[in-house]
Amino acid sequence: MTLGADVVMHSITKYIGGHSDVVAGCLCFNSSELYDRLFFNIKTMGTCISPFDAWIALRGSKTLALRAEKAASNALEIGKMLEKHPKI
């Protein structure tokens, strides 16, 4: 959003949920006007998350910081290893 996007889409399934037990995504809007224009369609077409799936995603979000920290740490270790590899 800070780079000028009107809408940002996030995969709740992969990152926020984190346990492969929910299929969801979310849209973040940079203005309430754009949100209001699309809300009716989102609501009436049934493209909103169910209460149970929202709870599952919320449960997974509680470990997001820990999982992201571990993923970053692992990526750094892999990068260090690859940096020293003679064929790379």
Please describe what each predicted stretch is.
Residues 1-85:
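Conserved PLP-enzyme active-site core in the AAT-like
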